[in-house]
Amino acid sequence: MDRAPAISSVEELLSVALDMERRAAARYAELARRMAEREHDALADLFTRLGRLERDHARFIERRLAGRLLPDPAGQASLESIVFDEASVLTPRAVLVAALRSEERAKALFERIAAAAQEAAVRRLAVEMAAEEAEHAERIAAAMQGLGD
């Protein structure tokens, strides 16, 4: 995705972010479960913590939007999910690489939204969201370093 979605209000941005946070929380919960099944306890713990962060972000956004009618985020922004079918090789490195790419795409999306934003409040919020995604990516990158080669 090279273009930023057209986001003209804080509510639109929060709607997109809420959808992304909910999907990420579910994705990380699934990855935590799968890593625990394979006895990769450190990764299961990492994905559990990331899932908790994403759920916390979603709850924060929900509180901020309390009672407001939200625009439908469909078509405004989408990120590829981390998708592994049962036949996929779920090596620790492969899972971490996929998770890192997902966080980097989310960061890049928010950076593009910030760069294209006409409204200062949208720009500030998108910059904050990009920074949060960067923090998630840093956690994943640190876990990759811990794997060695």
Regions found by a protein language model. Name each.
Residues A142-D149:
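Short, charged, intrinsically disordered terminal tails
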Residues D2-I7, A24-T48, A106-V122:
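Helix-loop segments that flank and shape redox-cofactor active sites
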Residues R59-A94:
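Carboxylate-rich helix-loop segments that flank metal/cofactor sites and access channels
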Residues S88-E128:
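A mid-sequence interfacial segment
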